[in-house]
Amino acid sequence: MAIITTNSDYFAHRYEVIIPFVVSTICSIVGIIGNGFITVIYGTEWVRSKRLPTGENLMLMLSFSRLLLQIWMMVEITYSLLFPIIYNHNAMYKLFKAISVFLNYCNLWFAAWLNVFYCLKIVNLAHPLFLLMKQKIIGLMPRLLSLSVLVSFSLSSFFSKDILNVYVNTSVPIPSSNSTKMKYIFMINVLSLAFLYYMGIFLPLFMFIMAATLLITSLKRHTLHMENSTTGSRDSSMEAHVGAIKSTSHSLILYIINALALFISMSNILGAYSVWNSLCNIIMTAYPAGQSVHLILRNPGLRRAWRRFQHHVHLYLKR
């Protein structure tokens, strides 16, 4: 069993608190506005019509989970930087990490199902299993989403056990002084942490990769068909393939970066209050913010709604 024990002094310089806190707060505000906007748009439509198409329902679930994730990370970073005594209490520390992992798992699952749904919608494949999934996916999606939340909760609950522990030593003497200082001692079971964490993200990441592979294969086949046809020009199907591939690749790359940052932050292998850990916190807050901006920019309906929102805000400020 590999254990990492980290002795961490609280901040030696004020800028080590201010700079990460300001940058993370800005990213969090952008993410809360972006994901909150998407949630309100689709949530209002759901309340008005009592139901949503499967794609829009997935967008609502994904944006709402990212909104919760963004708010929770903002709270966690605020406590870790400004209220370290409360945050580094062992039970509180485990609670923060377990909820962060749960929301990250849900976020990845919802994003994976969204990409799988659009893959099934766009790709034409004659395989019997693929055709069966294409027919059944709309009816099965509510159960799949519920199962994903249950799996995420079950796996994240293990992070409240003895994988992560933090202790406080208040009797560390200060040289040339009669006083003592406080040190936080983080004991991390890295093997258990890595196993549980990557077990939780393996299946949805595999779904991401499979969806991207099928889209690329289908696009290649469609391109060859168009080259052999009389026109040889891009059509709506090719545009849909290219757009879906770009979106899936964008989401996959950003999530892998975010997943690595979250693991490094949780394991404290670079120091609990180091510059690198602060960088990981910034990446984790920037990820859902960037994803919300990406969704708004690539979705025509959300772009129009955002322009209307900006117009109303502009008129309100001119009063």
Curated annotation (Swiss-Prot):
Cellular compartments annotated: Membrane
Q: What keywords would UniProt list here?
A: G-protein coupled receptor, Glycoprotein, Membrane, Receptor, Sensory transduction, Taste, Transducer, Transmembrane, Transmembrane helix
GO biological-process terms attached to the record: detection of chemical stimulus involved in sensory perception of bitter taste
Q: Which domain of life is it from?
A: Eukaryota
Q: Which residues lie on this side of the membrane: Extracellular?
A: 1-17, 88-97, 158-189, 273-281
Protein name (Swiss-Prot/TrEMBL): Taste receptor type 2 member 40
Its membrane topology:
Multi-pass membrane protein
* PANTHER family, per the entry: TASTE RECEPTOR TYPE 2, TASTE RECEPTOR TYPE 2 MEMBER 40
Task: Please give the Gene Ontology molecular function terms for this protein.
Answer: bitter taste receptor activity; G protein-coupled receptor activity; taste receptor activity
